[in-house]
Amino acid sequence: MQNKDACKSLSSWVSLSISLLVLTVPLIWPYNSTAFPIYAQQNYESPREATGRIVCANCHLAKKAVDIEVPQAVLPDTVFEAVVKIPYDTQIKQVLSNGKKGGLNVGAVLILPEGFELAPSDRIPPELKEKISNIYFQPYSPEKKNILVVGPLPGNKYSELVFPILSPDPATNKKASFLKYPIYLGGNRGRGQVYPDGSKSNNNVFSASTAGTISQITRQKKGGYEVIIKTTDGREVTDIIPPGPELIVSEGESIKADQLLTNNPNVGGFGQADAEIVLQDPLRIQGLLVFFASVILAQIFLVLKKKQFEKVQLAEMNF
């Protein structure tokens, strides 16, 4: 009985510790509070919409290029690598959630064909493990092992990511077939401009909520600004600008509704790319090799037969 109580107490303590860790991590590293792809996992059953749009684009509004490299074809039950490239100028800095400047983080979601999944550690060759380094990949959900997510990671170290992938074997996986399959990639560098609830992050532009004249601008102690706009009917409307964006207006200036009050601090962006891969049937390859061998042998026999015929003709002419 005492052992059961002790186990319950230990379990409660572990749960409490994990909860506290989850709550305090964003406070210690505030720039991860808008990190991807955790928002997509929490809010969407699938990261790819019916239109082909990856949901990360809902929060990361700017477009930037990404690239993916995979083999043209793979054999069943084989480990191969998918190389994801998220290029950007590593010298640039982004606005963090506290308004300060810092390095960009990167992340990616890789949507594989059904049956393809993250390769088990004991199946990954040593040379591939070196390329992966200490990167932690995870499935999008327990039901969607073919969708892999990674990040956020320091962009200056991981602008190129290597995913270890295990191909399915149609002999044991009835859902897999020897076909050509599409692979979809979504990759991002930097923080998002919008939170999942639709509110703006401080990595966005801010505009005036009403038309009027800016009567007062007050810089806040923790950063950011309080902009008071006096309307034509004498009302005073206060717009709050969080730390990060810089004001591009001044006191006494007349402004219109929705006129920009700040610059655009965002230096990152999200991009999509796709590729194709063939799950190749080994018997098909063997059949192709046999066909090529038969063609080569037929050519050899044809040449030999021709030479033999020429020798016979030459002998008859000499006779």
From Swiss-Prot:
Binds 1 heme group covalently. Its main location: plastid. It comes from the Eukaryota. GO terms for cellular component: chloroplast thylakoid membrane. Heme binds at F36, C56, C59, H60. GO terms for biological process: photosynthesis. GO terms for molecular function: electron transfer activity; heme binding; iron ion binding. The chain crosses the membrane at residues 285-305. InterPro entries: Cyt-f_TM (IPR024058), Cyt_f (IPR002325), Cyt_f_lg_dom (IPR024094), Cyt_f_lg_dom_sf (IPR036826), Rudment_hybrid_motif (IPR011054). It is found in: Plastid, Chloroplast thylakoid membrane. Component of the cytochrome b6-f complex, which mediates electron transfer between photosystem II (PSII) and photosystem I (PSI), cyclic electron flow around PSI, and state transitions. PANTHER family: CYTOCHROME F (PTHR33288:SF10), PTHR33288. The 4 large subunits of the cytochrome b6-f complex are cytochrome b6, subunit IV (17 kDa polypeptide, petD), cytochrome f and the Rieske protein, while the 4 small subunits are PetG, PetL, PetM and PetN. The complex functions as a dimer. This is Cytochrome f.
